[in-house]
A protein has these predicted regions:
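N-terminal hydrophobic segments of proteins, predominantly signal-anchor/transmembrane helices
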Residues: 22-46, 57-118, 385
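Interfacial loop-to-transmembrane-helix boundary motif in multi-pass membrane proteins
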Residues: 26-29, 81-92, 119-120, 128-159
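A juxtamembrane structural motif centered on a specific transmembrane helix
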Residues: 1-28, 68-75, 372-375, 406-427
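Membrane-interfacial helix-loop-helix modules of multi-pass inner-membrane proteins that assemble, modify
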Residues: 101-108, 138-143, 151-186, 311-323
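Long extracytoplasmic/lumenal interhelical loops at the membrane interface
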Residues: 269-276, 283, 298-348
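Membrane helix-loop boundary segments at the extracytoplasmic
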Residues: 35-50, 339, 343-348, 376-416
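Hydrophobic transmembrane alpha-helices and their immediate junctions
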Residues: 24, 205-206, 245-247, 344-386, ...
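Alpha-helical transmembrane segments of multi-pass inner-membrane proteins
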Residues: 141-169, 182-241
Length: 427
């Protein structure tokens, strides 16, 4: 072990010890929010309360505003990339509202408001989490310790689930007794939760490699295709992503090949088989975007969670034959939110689709440019969201707020460490 490595490890240990000693009540509060977001599905299934992610976004937003007012320009400055992200997001909102007016599809104003907030909550959470955790090594130290504790508990439970039925299993696949859902209600929630933990741990991949590997085992035991693709993506990045932190076309090519190989069967089944929910939603979305060109149907008209209720069931589902598809019929809409891009295309049209893609690209560029030392966390975060967008509501999903929360913590801690390293060297 070189002297430089020993020195770096010593600095890291000193910083973490100091961080724990300097823990504030606000840090404990953010840790509570971290837990509420992680266990949101358990809270929803147990107590029927389903607004934790929305409340977390509002709390993040008002905390950011308060910090901006209190610190003025010393803590928060809006750069070109985040401004572009917000401008494009605002454009999507305008396009969606214009679509509601022009398309003439009958929807209630309250549903439009709910769907609009669903559209903006994750991008807002990303930006606010970045600014609110500015230079905060304390919260990251606390969250990293808890992340490792959660991984141990989940791994033991996942292995036991292979042998015994004790309420943490879902349907079996690939010859195994059952897939793992922990206390989160569905295996896909476990994949998202572990992805968030990996994003946090990835900023220090050398020290946390074993913990990340355990998280990948948990993801694998959910038996979900998106989980396998995410594991392959993470493995490629962990093996090939060097110290210079350069993401190249070769990385993208390797990830695309692995993703295609691992997800091909599921893609063919869901998107190329006539009569499946995802296939029919995709075809209907394209038709809607063409019929209502240049806009779409507007908010709360197609594919969004708010339209799953019988009272809010969209007239477009009858018009485009969606109401006759198993899993999409009135009162039986269990597969209605299993897509993301068809919802964007159907509700916002081709122009709105371009705006939304641009917004995501700007968000990624913003985080990647501001995350020296944590670029791997950024890549894993957006890779997971892109992978999940093929089979769930991705950026509209409640767990996406948890992912945004996790990335904000990972990046802010890295920046804090850089500042402290500079101070250490000056001494």
């Amino acid at each position: 072990m070189s002297l430089a490595t020993v020195d770096a490890n010593y600095r890291s240990a000193v910083q973490r010890s100091t961080a724990f000693l300097e823990t504030r009540m606000s840090d404990v509060g953010w840790l509570v929010w971290f837990n509420l977001l992680f266990f949101e599905m358990w809270v929803q299934n147990t107590f029927g309360f389903s607004y934790i992610d929305e409340l977390a976004v509002l709390f993040l937003f008002f905390a950011t505003v308060f910090k901006a007012v209190r610190m003025r320009k010393r803590a928060i400055t809006i750069g070109s990339l985040e401004k572009r992200s917000l401008d494009l997001l605002f454009g999507v909102c305008i396009i969606g509202l214009a679509g509601n007016v022009i398309s003439g599809v009958s929807v209630s104003p309250s549903n439009v408001a709910v769907d609009l907030f669903t559209c903006i909550k994750t991008p807002i959470a990303f930006i606010c989490a970045y600014f609110i955790f500015y230079d905060n090594q304390r919260i990251e130290s606390m969250v990293e310790v808890e992340s490792k504790f959660l991984i141990v508990i989940m791994l033991v439970s996942a292995v036991m689930n292979l042998l015994f039925d004790f309420g943490m299993g879902w349907e079996g696949r690939y010859g195994l007794r059952s897939s793992f859902c922990f206390v989160l209600g569905h295996p896909t929630m476990v994949v998202a939760a572990c992805a968030g933990l990996v994003v946090i741990l990835a900023r220090n991949r050398q020290d946390n490699f074993a913990w990340m590997s355990m998280a990948f085992v948990i993801i694998a035991l959910t038996l979900r295709s998106k989980g396998f693709v995410f594991i392959a993506t993470a493995a490629i990045l962990l093996i090939t992503y060097g110290r210079h932190e350069k993401f190249t076309f070769l990385h993208l090519l390797l990830i695309a090949v692995c993703g295609f190989y691992l997800g091909y069967d599921q893609f063919i089944y869901y998107f190329s088989t006539e009569g499946t929910a995802r296939n029919e939603l995709t075809k209907a979305a394209v038709r809607i975007a063409n019929d209502f060109f240049p806009l779409g149907g507007g908010f709360a008209t197609f594919g969004s969670a708010v339209t799953a209720n019988v009272a809010s069931y969209s007239p477009l589902y009858y018009q485009y034959g969606i109401s006759n598809i198993w899993g999409l019929t009135p009162g039986q809409t269990m597969f209605l939110s299993d897509t993301f891009w068809p919802t964007v295309i159907g509700q916002f049209g081709w122009i709105g689709f371009a705006f939304y893609v641009g917004m995501i690209g700007s968000l990624f560029a913003f985080f990647y440019s501001r995350s020296s030392g944590a670029k791997l966390s950024v890549l894993l975060c957006f890779a997971y969201l892109f992978i999940s967008s093929t089979s769930e509501s991705a950026f509209f999903h409640p767990m996406s707020v948890f992912i945004a929360f996790s990335l904000g913590i990972a990046i802010a801690a890295t920046r804090s460490a850089q500042v402290q390293n500079c101070e250490y060297e000056d001494k």
